[in-house]
UniProtKB/Swiss-Prot annotation:
The keyword Amino-acid biosynthesis applies. Its EC number is 4.2.3.4. This is 3-dehydroquinate synthase. Belongs to the sugar phosphate cyclases superfamily. Dehydroquinate synthase family. Binds 1 divalent metal cation per subunit. Can use either Co(2+) or Zn(2+). It comes from Klebsiella pneumoniae (strain 342). Pathway: Metabolic intermediate biosynthesis; chorismate biosynthesis; chorismate from D-erythrose 4-phosphate and phosphoenolpyruvate: step 2/7. CDD domains: DHQS (cd08195). GO terms for cellular component: cytoplasm. SUPFAM superfamilies: Dehydroquinate synthase-like (SSF56796). Zn(2+) binds at E184, H247, H264. Keywords: Amino-acid biosynthesis, Aromatic amino acid biosynthesis, Cobalt, Cytoplasm, Lyase, Metal-binding, NAD, Nucleotide-binding, Zinc.
Length: 364
């Protein structure tokens, strides 16, 4: 079992990583006998895990209700979140309830925002079931829903009280979803840890084969890196923005193509290549390092260019609505070397457009 802590003073919380956690009531602490909980999951995951998690909580004496939402990024909306509020009010659940987010990034983000909003804030536990949510979105307290004009534009910072990572969930994960999660894994190596990036180059096949030892180390290292960043910059005033490498380009792809048509990790993968080409054009990143990123993404089964039907100009309106934009200045996370990155403002639009063109036209 791997266990680490996100250190945020009184709001610190544990991350527990192991196979078989769903069978142990202690995994879901601080829930205890007599507590009330609302399990939030989706139609795909409910047949796989809902009864197991409900049963282990009920064995611990927790009073459990559940709400099952439709599955997909397109349902990460205010309208669907209202379904959660209705379920909470109908039971009813008070301010002492705990929401349990049983799912991937969509369920985690939506449930977290519902927890932040319901009766001005209730506890919630993250139980991430996808690799992407296990290494990234479940840690750090960013919660949100999408708006037709932008991804994650309506939300709040609201930390969970615990993160429960059961490695067995990855056994039911479609290959495309596994690859999507590996995009965020690779991102950590690019922005923060060159040694981890090299480890990934040597172990990507083991991760794709769901080798338990390799996967446990991978998830722990990603969570360690994110926990360090969140502890230093919870509200994303500086350092935490580095975790958005590839996301400004990637969110543009997701919004333009329609939420759910490109998985988040797929869009981020293409966005990382665009960010690398942008940094190359600014003279601060080596072409051979861009190629290392491309090669690793391809080995992980990820796209290394954006949609062919999306012009370079189509990116800019979406990118100018990015949350990192300040006073009309598009700020981008750019790699400086494998394991080092910066948040840079004042990047000329012609450089960005050229980098997108480089990505789309390259013989990769």
């Amino acid at each position: 079992m791997e266990r680490l802590t996100v250190t945020l003073g009184e709001r610190s919380y544990p991350i527990t990583i192991a196979a078989g956690l769903f069978n142990d009531p202690a995994s879901f602490l601080p829930l205890k006998s007599g507590d009330q909980a609302m399990l939030v999951t989706n139609e795909t995951l409910a047949p796989l895990y809902l009864d197991t998690v409900r049963s282990v909580l009920e064995q611990a004496g927790v009073n459990v209700d559940s709400v099952i939402l439709p599955d997909g990024e397109q349902y990460k909306s205010l309208a669907v979140m209202d379904t959660v509020f209705t379920a909470l009010l109908q039971k009813p659940h008070g301010r002492d309830t705990t929401l349990v987010a049983l799912g991937g990034g969509v369920i985690g983000d939506l449930t977290g925002f519902a927890a932040a909003s319901y009766q001005r804030g209730v506890r919630f536990i993250q139980v991430p079931t996808t690799l992407l949510s296990q290494v990234d979105s479940s840690v750090g307290g960013k919660t949100a829903v999408n708006h037709p004009l932008g991804k994650n534009m309506i939300g709040a910072f609201w930390q969970p009280v615990s993160v429960v990572v059961d490695l067995n969930c990855l056994k039911t994960l479609p290959a495309r979803e596994l690859a999507s999660g590996l995009a965020e894994v690779i991102k950590y190596g690019v922005i923060l840890d060159g040694e981890f990036f090299s480890w990934l180059e040597n172990n990507i096949d083991a991760l794709l084969a769901l080798d338990e030892k390799a996967m446990a180390y991978c998830i722990r290292r990603c969570c360690e890196l994110k926990a360090e960043v969140v502890a230093a910059d919870e509200r994303e005033t500086g350092l935490r923005a580095l975790l958005n490498l590839g996301h400004t380009f990637g969110h543009a792809i997701e919004a333009e193509m329609g939420y759910g048509n490109w998985l988040h990790g797929e869009a981020v993968a293409a966005g990382m290549v665009m960010a690398a080409h942008t940094s190359e054009r600014l003279g601060q990143f080596r072409a051979q390092d861009t190629q290392r990123i491309i090669d690793l993404l391809k080995r992980a089964g990820l796209p290394v260019r954006g949609p062919q039907e999306m012009s370079a100009q189509a990116y800019l309106p979406h990118m100018m609505r990015d949350k990192k934009v300040l006073a009309g200045d598009m700020r981008l996370v750019l790699p400086l070397a494998i394991g080092s990155s910066e948040l840079r403002g004042g990047v000329p639009h012609d450089v960005v457009l050229g980098a997108i063109a480089d990505t789309q036209q390259a013989q990769q």
